[in-house]
Amino acid sequence: MCFGYDGEMSTKPRTVTFDGAPAPGVINFGVGQPSEDLLPVGLLRTATADFMATAQPLELNYGERQGDAGFRAALANVLTSAYEHPVNDDSLFVTGGNSQALDFICGQFASQGDNVFIEEPSYFLAHQIFADHGLSVVGIPVDEDGLIIEALVEKLRSHRPALLYTIPSYHNPGGQTLSAERRRAVAALSLEHDFLVVADEVYQLLHYFDKPPPAMGTMTGEGNILSLGSFSKIMAPGLRLGWIQTSGNLVEKLLGIGVINSGGSLNHFTSHVMRHAIDLGLQESWLRHLRETYRQRVETMDAALRRE
């Protein structure tokens, strides 16, 4: 069961992705996707034309399993700048977005009946992915600084998790951000108790005021962390393009996924388009635009709620 947006219990999962626009004058807060005016058709048209102007035939082939090398190099540069920490392109594995990444990780690093620790509450559709793999969900309480480490330690005394799923920055639905100290504690506990940390960092780059603590992607050298990123929130969900940043040994295990061995690089064409968007500076300028626009909208909504 899951909670509907009206707060009532529902036995059916809600569909949260659609193509239709809300009625005039309606702002739909029940769907985690950009408004129509923040879907950059012109930008992507420019990037696509730039790619096709110089495209080589083999660039339309299946592509290497880890993802296009040129795209991964461009993405590594973006993350290095954003994280203020070196990111190696070999640590990046291209995905079709964070939902697919989470599904891959559950299938590759957990077995039916295994425990997965999550923040309580957490992104409600992640529950369905865990259920698809027969995983047992164990909730860990949070406060204003994110997942409570003492509660995690206590739960580790009675449960052995295969995975810990966390949304460290700008949590959905709670809004809190995991402090730097707690991020380090989670990483240390993952090594001590031999579980993998799945950090859903889809909001890490969408800071409107102060920057969040360093991404958990900067800790992947520890060996037990998989950092999930996506262009769904910082460009367009329809691109279905994202990445997993992790250690070399975990990348090797991801390369063993059957669908990767069969089909090669995921969203290979889209990867080329985004590489050109990055190289042209379009991705960086669009991200600045999103931050400023969302900051203004947050301030407008906050002021309206305070008036009420």
Identify what each model region corresponds to.
Residues 5-97, 278-285, 299-300:
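N-terminal small-domain helix-loop-helix segment of the aminotransferase-like
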Residues 58-193, 204-222, 294:
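Conserved core of the PLP fold type I
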Residues 32-36, 99, 123, 169-171, ...:
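Short, solvent-exposed loop/turn segments at secondary-structure junctions
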Residues 38, 42, 46, 66-69, ...:
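Alpha-helix N-cap/helix-start motif at coil-to-helix transitions, marked by capping-box chemistry
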Residues 196, 206, 234-236:
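Short glycine/serine/proline-enriched coil/turn segments at secondary-structure junctions
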Residues 221-295, 299:
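Conserved core segment of the aminotransferase class I/II
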Residues 36-38, 173-176, 263:
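A generic structural signal for short coil/turn motifs at secondary-structure boundaries
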